[in-house]
C-alpha cells in the first residue's frame, strides 16, 4: 500500500498529516520545506544533537520499507503481494515508533526510506537513483544496504555499479583527508538467508567486492593510496525469510533493533563491526548538525546534488551554521535595533538641522545593547560549527560595533564641534565684555582659561560614551585632534582680534591723516604771504615743501600707530611673526589711506577751488595781505599775469609726490619693507597692490607717486585759466566802473523835486503796499538774475504785438472801400515792405524781439 498519513511535498497540512512521517523529496526531485515542522511536532528539534539518522538503500521490491517498519515501528508503504510494482517514490522520513524498544534503543531515531533502485518505472534513468543514494550517504550516520542472499557476488544485482558511482562522487566531493571527514557505517542486511552459506563467507565476499570496487574508482590527487576502510565501517547481519520463517524473522528483527543504540569507538576495531550485539551509533558517525538546522542542511545538500554542484560535507555543515547563525543574528539584532535606531535617527536629525547636540546617557545605552546582543547570540549559536560560529560572532560583533562606532564617532564629533563652538563663543563674549567695560582685557589669559574648561568638558563627555571592551572607543586620538583644533581656533581668534585691533588703529590713522593732510592741502589756497612768482623769489613754504610735510606727517602718524599696535598685541600672546605681519599690513593699509586722501584732495572740484583761492589771494591782495581796490591807474594786467603764472606752477608740483630735499619720490618700498616670511595668502587678499613694492604689478614706484597724469594736468590748466580770466574781467570792470559815477548833487535835487510824490505814496496805503510788492518783486528778480530775460521777452512781445497790429490794420483796410483806395494810392515800395514782414513768426525772432539774422538773410534772398 502507499504511504498514508504522511505529509507530502507542498502540502499545507495540519498536525494529523504528520502522524506517520513526511515525504522529504518527491519523485520530481522537489525538497519538502516542511521538514522542520515535522521535526518540531515530533519534539526532535529541542534535542539539539541528540538524534540519529538512518537511511535504507537497495533494489526496488526487496522489502526495504518492510524491514524499516518491523525494525522501527514505522508505517512506510509496502508493496502489494498481488502485484510487483514501485511503492516508495522519492525519499520518506519517519521517527522511530517501536514501542518495545524501550531504553534499549537510542532516542530520536529518524529513518529515511529511499526509493529503490533498478525499478522498471524509471528504467535506464539512473539519475534519481544516484542522487538519492548520494543524498542518503551524505546525510545519514548509518546506511542500511538491503540485499538478498542470492544477490551477494553479483555486480548489478548487488548494486555495485551504483555504489561505485556514489563512492567516486562522494570521494571527490569530500574533504581531501580522512581525519576531517565524518565516517559512515554501511550496514548490510542480508535478507532471506537460508543458512547454507555461512554469514562469514557472505561477509568476506561483500568486503572483497567493495575493496575491489574501491580500487577501480577515480580518486583525487593525494588520495590514490586511500582505502575504503578510511571512510567507511562495515556491519553485517542475516535475516531469515519473512514468508517462510515469519517467527524467526520477527525474532531476528527484534534482536537487531536492540543494536540501534549509542556506543563508543573501540580502538581495537578498525572498520568492521562483527559482534551480534555491538551498538550501531558511534560518535564518529554523527554529522554534528543540530536538529533545528537539519532541514536547512538537508535542503542545501539536495540542492547541490540536484544541480550537480560540488558537495563538500564540512562546507554544508558550515553552510547550515551560516544559515542558522545568520538567522540567530537577525533575531538578536531586533532588540538591538529597538535601542540603537532611535539614537541613530536623533543623530541624523541633528545632522540635517546642522546642530551638534549630545545624546544623554549614550554610553550606558550602547554598552547595555552591545552586551545583550552578543550574549543572546552566544547562547543560541555556540552549538553550531565552531569555526562558523566564531566567524559569525566576529561578523555580528563587527556589525554591532560598526553601528556603535558610528554613534560613538558622531557623538564624539558633536562633543568636538560643540566644544569648539562653546570655546569660540566664550572667548568672544569675554572679549566683548571687556570692550564694553572699556577695560584693557588680557586676551591671552581669556583664551587659556576657556581652553582648560573646554578640554575638561570634552574628556568628561568622551569618557561617559566609551564602550567596554571595544578598543575603538578610545578617545585619545580625538583628544589630540581636539587640542590641536583648539590651538588653531585660538590662533584664528587671536588673528581676528589682531585684525580688529589693526582695523581700529587704521581708523585712527585715517582720522589723523584726514585732518592733518587736509590742513596741509588747504594751505595751498592761501598765497598772501608769498613774495611773488617763482621767477622773482622763492616759493611760499605752503607750496615748496608740501610733499615733505605730507610725508613727515604720514610717517610720524604711522609710527605712533605702530607703537599702539605693538603695545596692545603684547596682551594677545602674539608671536613675533604675527606682530611683524600686523605691522607690515598696517604700513600698507596706511599708505592706502594716505593715497586715497591725496586723491580726494586733488579731485577736479577740490583742486580747482584751491588753485582759484591761491590765485585770488595773490591777485587781490598785496604783499602785506591787504585787499586791493582796483583803480584805472593800477597795473591789473601785470598783477594778473604774475599771479596766474605763479599759481600755474603749482600744478606740476602737485602732479608728482616728490620730496623737496631729494627731488625724488619718498622711499616707500624701503619704508614698507619686504613681506615677512610668515605672511599667508589670507593676510594679503585684502591688500591693494602698490607700485614699486609688489613685484607682480606692472606699475613702478614712479607710477605709484604720480598724482596727476599729463591729461589731467592739461585739463586742469585749461579750467584754471578760464576761472582766472573771469576774475581778471571782474577786476577790469571794477576799475572802469569808477569813471561813470552819478554826480553827488543829483541825489538832493531828485529828492527835493520828488518830495510831494514820495509823501503821497507814503500816505496812501494802496500805493504804499503796491510799492512794497514792487520792491519785493524787483529784489527777487535781481536775486535770481532774471532782469535780462524779462527785458528780452518784453522787447520780443512788443515787437510781435506791433507786427500783429499792423497785420490787423492791413486786413481791415483791405476789407473796406476807403482802405482799398488809400492802398491803391500808396507806392509800390510800401507793398514790398508789407510783403517783407507778412510772414514773420514769433519763433523767428532773436533775443531782443527782432527778426533773427537768418530770417533777414532769407528775406533779402527772396
UniProtKB/Swiss-Prot annotation:
Q: Which residues lie on this side of the membrane: Lumenal?
A: 763-765
One GO molecular-function annotation for this sequence?
A: GTPase activity
Name the Enzyme Commission number(s) assigned to this protein.
3.6.5.-
SUPFAM superfamilies linked to this entry: P-loop containing nucleoside triphosphate hydrolases
The GB1/RHD3-type G domain, residue ranges: 48-298
Which Pfam families does this entry report, sorted A to Z?
Answer: RHD3_GTPase (PF05879), Sey1_3HB (PF20428)
Q: Which InterPro entries does this chain map to?
A: G_GB1_RHD3_dom, P-loop_NTPase, RHD3/Sey1, Sey1/RHD3-like_3HB
Q: Where does GTP bind?
A: 58-65
Residue runs in coiled coils: 473-499
Q: What biological process terms from GO does the record include?
A: endoplasmic reticulum membrane fusion
- Bilayer-crossing residues are 742-762, 766-786
Q: Which GO terms describe its cellular component?
A: endoplasmic reticulum membrane
Residue ranges under compositional bias (Basic and acidic residues)?
833-856
Membrane topology per the entry is: Multi-pass membrane protein
Q: Which residues lie on this side of the membrane: Cytoplasmic?
A: 1-741, 787-862
Its chief place of residence is: endoplasmic reticulum
The entry assigns this protein to a family as follows: Belongs to the TRAFAC class dynamin-like GTPase superfamily. GB1/RHD3 GTPase family. RHD3 subfamily.
Role, per record: Cooperates with the reticulon proteins and tubule-shaping DP1 family proteins to generate and maintain the structure of the tubular endoplasmic reticulum network. Has GTPase activity, which is required for its function in ER organization.
Q: What name goes with this protein?
A: Protein sey1
Provide the species name: Pyrenophora tritici-repentis (strain Pt-1C-BFP)
What is the taxonomic lineage of the source species? Eukaryota, Fungi, Dikarya, Ascomycota, Pezizomycotina
Q: Which gene encodes it?
A: sey1
Amino acid at each position: 500500500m502507499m504511504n498514508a498519513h504522511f505529509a507530502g511535498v507542498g502540502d499545507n497540512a495540519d498536525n494529523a498529516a504528520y502522524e506517520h512521517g513526511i515525504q522529504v523529496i518527491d519523485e520530481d526531485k522537489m525538497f519538502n520545506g516542511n521538514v522542520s515542522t515535522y521535526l518540531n511536532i515530533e519534539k526532535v528539534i529541542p534535542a539539539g544533537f541528540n538524534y540519529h539518522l538512518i537511511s535504507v538503500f537497495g533494489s526496488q521490491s526487496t522489502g526495504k520499507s518492510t524491514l524499516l517498519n518491523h525494525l522501527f515501528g514505522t508505517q512506510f508503504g509496502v508493496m502489494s503481494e498481488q502485484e510487483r510494482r514501485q511503492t516508495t517514490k522519492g525519499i520518506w522520513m519517519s521517527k522511530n515508533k517501536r514501542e518495545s524498544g524501550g531504553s534499549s534503543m537510542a532516542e530520536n531515531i529518524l529513518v529515511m526510506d529511499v526509493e529503490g533502485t533498478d525499478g522498471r518505472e524509471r528504467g535506464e534513468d539512473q539519475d534519481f537513483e544516484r542522487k538519492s543514494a548520494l543524498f542518503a550517504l551524505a546525510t545519514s550516520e548509518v546506511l542500511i544496504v538491503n540485499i538478498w542472499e542470492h544477490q551477494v557476488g553479483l555486480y548489478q544485482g548487488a548494486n555495485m555499479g551504483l555504489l561505485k558511482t556514489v563512492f567516486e562522487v562522494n570521494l571527490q566531493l569530500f574533504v581531501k583527508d580522512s581525519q576531517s571527514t565524518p565516517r559512515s557505517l554501511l550496514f548490510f542486511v542480508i535478507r532471506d538467508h537460508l543458512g547454507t552459506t555461512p554469514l562469514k563467507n557472505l561477509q568476506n565476499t561483500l568486503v572483497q567486492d567493495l575493496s575491489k570496487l574501491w580500487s577501480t574508482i577515480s580518486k583525487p590527487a593525494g588520495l590514490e593510496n586511500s582505502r575504503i576502510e578510511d571512510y567507511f565501517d562495515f556491519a553485517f547481519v542475516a535475516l531469515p525469510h519473512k514468508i517462510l520463517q515469519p517467527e524467526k524473522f520477527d525474532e531476528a528483527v527484534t534482536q537487531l533493533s536492540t543494536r540501534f543504540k549509542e556506543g563508543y569507538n573501540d580502538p581495537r576495531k578498525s572498520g568492521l563491526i562483527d559482534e551480534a550485539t555491538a551498538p550501531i551509533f558511534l560518535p564518529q558517525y554523527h554529522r554534528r548538525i543540530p536538529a533545528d538546522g537539519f532541514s536547512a542542511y538537508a535542503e542545501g545538500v539536495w540542492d547541490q546534488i540536484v544541480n550537480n554542484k560540488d558537495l563538500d560535507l564540512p562546507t554544508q555543515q558550515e553552510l547550515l551554521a551560516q544559515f542558522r547563525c545568520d538567522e540567530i543574528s537577525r533575531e538578536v539584532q531586533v532588540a538591538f535595533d529597538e535601542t540603537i535606531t532611535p539614537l541613530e535617527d536623533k543623530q541624523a536629525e541633528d545632522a540635517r538641522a546642522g546642530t551638534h547636540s549630545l545624546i544623554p546617557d549614550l554610553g550606558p545605552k550602547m554598552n547595555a545593547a552591545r552586551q545583550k546582543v552578543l550574549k543572546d547570540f552566544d547562547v543560541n549559536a555556540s552549538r553550531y560549527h565552531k569555526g562558523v560560529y566564531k566567524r559569525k560572532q566576529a561578523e555580528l560583533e563587527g556589525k554591532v560595533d560598526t553601528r556603535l562606532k558610528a554613534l560613538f564617532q558622531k557623538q564624539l564629533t558633536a562633543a568636538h564641534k560643540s566644544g569648539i563652538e562653546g570655546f569660540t563663543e566664550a572667548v568672544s563674549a569675554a572679549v566683548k565684555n571687556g570692550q564694553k567695560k572699556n577695560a584693557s582685557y588680557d586676551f591671552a589669559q581669556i583664551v587659556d582659561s576657556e581652553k582648560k574648561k573646554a578640554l575638561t568638558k570634552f574628556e568628561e563627555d568622551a569618557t561617559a560614551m566609551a564602550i567596554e571592551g571595544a578598543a575603538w572607543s578610545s578617545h585619545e586620538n580625538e583628544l589630540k585632534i581636539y587640542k590641536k583644533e583648539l590651538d588653531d581656533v585660538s590662533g584664528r581668534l587671536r588673528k581676528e582680534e589682531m585684525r580688529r585691533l589693526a582695523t581700529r588703529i587704521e581708523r585712527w590713522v585715517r582720522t589723523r591723516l584726514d585732518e592733518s593732510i587736509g590742513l596741509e592741502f588747504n594751505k595751498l589756497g592761501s598765497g598772501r604771504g608769498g613774495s611773488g612768482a617763482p621767477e622773482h623769489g622763492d616759493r611760499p613754504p605752503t607750496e615748496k615743501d608740501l610733499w615733505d610735510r605730507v610725508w613727515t606727517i604720514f610717517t610720524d602718524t604711522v609710527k605712533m600707530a605702530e607703537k599702539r599696535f605693538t603695545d596692545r598685541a603684547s596682551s594677545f600672546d602674539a608671536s613675533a611673526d604675527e606682530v611683524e605681519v600686523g605691522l607690515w599690513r598696517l604700513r600698507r593699509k596706511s599708505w592706502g589711506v594716505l593715497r586715497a586722501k591725496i586723491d580726494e584732495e586733488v579731485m577736479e572740484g577740490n583742486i580747482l577751488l584751491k588753485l582759484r583761492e591761491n590765485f585770488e589771494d595773490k591777485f587781490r591782495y598785496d604783499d602785506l595781505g591787504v585787499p586791493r581796490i582796483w583803480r584805472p591807474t593800477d597795473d591789473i594786467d601785470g598783477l594778473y599775469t604774475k599771479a596766474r603764472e605763479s599759481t600755474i606752477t603749482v600744478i606740476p608740483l602737485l602732479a608728482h609726490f616728490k620730496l623737496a630735499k631729494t627731488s625724488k619720490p619718498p622711499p616707500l618700498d624701503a619704508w614698507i619693507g619686504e613681506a615677512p616670511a610668515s605672511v599667508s595668502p589670507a593676510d594679503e587678499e585684502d591688500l591693494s597692490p602698490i607700485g614699486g613694492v609688489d613685484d607682480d604689478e606692472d606699475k613702478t614706484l614712479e607710477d605709484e607717486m604720480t598724482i596727476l597724469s599729463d591729461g589731467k594736468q592739461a585739463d586742469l590748466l585749461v579750467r584754471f585759466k578760464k576761472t582766472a580770466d573771469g576774475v581778471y574781467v571782474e577786476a577790469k570792470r571794477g576799475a572802469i566802473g569808477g569813471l561813470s559815477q552819478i554826480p553827488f548833487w543829483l541825489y538832493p535835487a531828485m529828492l527835493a523835486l520828488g518830495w510831494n510824490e514820495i509823501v503821497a505814496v507814503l500816505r496812501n496805503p494802496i500805493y504804499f503796499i503796491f510799492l512794497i510788492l514792487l520792491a519785493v518783486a524787483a529784489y527777487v528778480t535781481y536775486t535770481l538774475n532774471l532782469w535780462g530775460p524779462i527785458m528780452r521777452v518784453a522787447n520780443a512781445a512788443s515787437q510781435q504785438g506791433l507786427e500783429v497790429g499792423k497785420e490787423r490794420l492791413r486786413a481791415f483796410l483791405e476789407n473796406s472801400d476807403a482802405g482799398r483806395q488809400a492802398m491803391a494810392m500808396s507806392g509800390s515800395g510800401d507793398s514790398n515792405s508789407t510783403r517783407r514782414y507778412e510772414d514773420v513768426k514769433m519763433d523767428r525772432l532773436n533775443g531782443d524781439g527782432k527778426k533773427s539774422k537768418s530770417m533777414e538773410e532769407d528775406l533779402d534772398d527772396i
